[in-house]
Amino acid sequence: MLCLSGEGTRTYIQSGEAFYINGSDADSKNGLMTDNTNYLNSTKVINRFISKLSDLQDYSKAEMHKNHEAATLQLKSYTWNFDIVPCFYTDTGFYLIPDGSGNWKKTDPRIDNEHITDINQKHNGKLLELIRLAKYWNNRKVTIRIGSYLLECMILQKYENKEASENWWIDLEFRDLLNYLSSAILSDVDDPKGIQGNLNSFCWDDRCKISDALTNAYNKAVEASNMELNDKNQKGAITKWGE
């Protein structure tokens, strides 16, 4: 999240779950307002970021995220992506971020940070490495990319309800995680903050495609772990993991 300064002058109104931020003369001159209104359009703000970031040499691509709530950046020097989410911090203690429809919605990343810290500590500080591995797999484009936050929440959902184990092998944890995710992606995923509701905005067909890819990856992971543990074929296991 990248906080924008309101300089103490911006105001907003709420209608249901949607928030509308009143724009300024500068916003109007920069074409950042929703047509025929005085409200700052979150989609246009993201596009403004994209147009500026595209000029930087360190980035290979900057584009709108599928959910229209962030700018996705691809770096030249790394294989993973970064999502940039513009936000405003309010005087009542929460943040406003794009809602995907041009308006704004309420969130609070501090709750997320506390949530992931607690669960990671429960599992002896080993969970973050597993999350990074899952995100690396997700970015290999073997299927429709799962949003980083959605993926993280599904993983936390699994490990929040799992007892900590002293016998932690990241390859076996990742194997079993793939199996869990293949089922979890088919269902709605509640926002752990209790703010955004269901985080899984994929249609049923896309959910099934992602689930099939996760199942396929799980089956390969089972083969790889069997090669290593039962057949003592470490080289073959490494090759299978690479698939």
Give the positions of each predicted feature:
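Short, charged/polar surface micro-motifs in flexible loops or helix N-caps
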Residues: G6-T9, Y89-T90
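Soluble non-cytosolic domains of exported or imported proteins
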Residues: L40-K44, N124-G125, Y149
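Conserved nucleotidyltransferase catalytic core and NTase-mimicking acidic/glycine-rich helix/loop elements
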Residues: K126-D231, K240
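Short loop/turn segments at strand-loop or loop-helix junctions that form parts
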Residues: L2-E7, K29-N30
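Extended, alpha-helix-rich binding/interface surfaces that flank or overlap catalytic cores
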Residues: Q74, T79-K126, L130-R132, G197-S211, ...
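Conserved catalytic core of two-metal-ion nucleotidyltransferases
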Residues: S15-F94
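Intrinsically disordered, low-complexity Ser/Thr/Pro/Gly-rich regulatory segments
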Residues: G8-T11, M33
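Acidic, low-complexity intrinsically disordered regions
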Residues: S5-E7, I50, S165
